[in-house]
Amino acid sequence: MSAEIMKKEDNKITLKIVVGADQFEVAINKAYNKMKSSFNIPGFRKGKVPRKLVEQRYGVEVFFEDAMNIVLPDAYEGALQELNIDPIDRPEFDFGEIKKGEDVEFTAEVQVMPEFTVEGYKGIEVEKNEYNVQEEDVQNELNKLTEQNARMIAVEDRPVQDGDMVVIDYKGFVGEDQFEGGTAEKQSLTIGSNQFIPGFEEQLIGASIGDEIKVKVTFPEEYHSEELAGKEATFEVMVHEIKEKELPALDDEFAKDVSEFDTLAELKADLSTKLEESAKKRTEQEYRNNVIEAVANQVELEIPNAVIERQINNMLLDFDYQLKYQGMTLESYYQMTGTKEEDLRGQMREDAEKRAKQQLVLDRISEMEKIEATETDVSEELERMATQYKQELDKLKSNLRDQDYTSIKEGIIVRKTIDLLAENAKVS
């Protein structure tokens, strides 16, 4: 096999690849052995028809396509290695005429990253915002704890107020017709939560237990159900229960109930410490992000569409994982939001292009600075992962695949590269 670059234009390269006649003959024999059981010729048992007889009956080219499929992957990969080419997308092949006993020639057009340089990445000026914890931040955390530990108390002597939880039955109508999905019994709803269609919850304020009321709403134009979008509807609602939130007292007893501390003062001190740690991490992470963005913004680089699409694919996988963690799927998300995959891809595109550029710039800097992931780096990362996932180190290692180790090393290199940039940046 031999290969050469025929043409190079912008970020497209056309390769000429030649597979020797002897090598192709071996592939033809493999194709014949794979297919011979499918030929039925009188006088021969199935799978015993000689190759020459098959070629005489069906033509010498009968095995060419399968033989080409056999030699193509290795020939293409060999050409990439020989010419030191790293494609960013699938190749486009063009096959010429194949003649028996002759070398086989074909071309492969591949996309590669456009050439670009990264300069001035050390000493770049970057803003660093310091986030500090205030007393009101601690109080907000305490308020969240009280909300989480509130009790819902049944109310019978007053009508519905904002913030109450109500238990209702409802039936929805458009005109005289009841619509699908518009009926429920013993449905819990917090007034002011905006869970329902705009205008629905507010009309329940003032209703009492046992009341039957009619709630008139207009579905939003962008509502996920096209049959209901923009239409006026009436809901017949029956109020069964009214409950109000009772917050616990903020005292030492509360601290004992919700934490390992004996006093409210100790709980507040712990919350303050955690908030300070979080603020410090936020300060550092935002600073590192600013450094990456500032360095990448200096680089003139048009990101190929194939790279952007690949980044969008990765972002979609991450989003799908997040949805599954919340008990949803992409399909249910599309239905709920009235969108399609192409809409979501469009929303992600700008961010995907930004991320792709930053990653390419970081990769180039790591090459220039000869940054590597040492055995010590990998060992420390594995120990950190074992602690995070609460696994024994040996068990964690046994579950890791080769590609997992590759990802770990790549992550270490990226982190060390950002460390280098952050340490050498000037805080403005």
Curated annotation (Swiss-Prot):
The keyword Isomerase applies. GO terms for cellular component: cytoplasm. It catalyses: [protein]-peptidylproline (omega=180) = [protein]-peptidylproline (omega=0). Residues 163-248 form the PPIase FKBP-type domain. Its main location: cytoplasm. The keyword Cytoplasm applies. Consists of 3 domains; the N-terminus binds the ribosome, the middle domain has PPIase activity, while the C-terminus has intrinsic chaperone activity on its own. Involved in protein export. Acts as a chaperone by maintaining the newly synthesized protein in an open conformation. Functions as a peptidyl-prolyl cis-trans isomerase. This is Trigger factor.
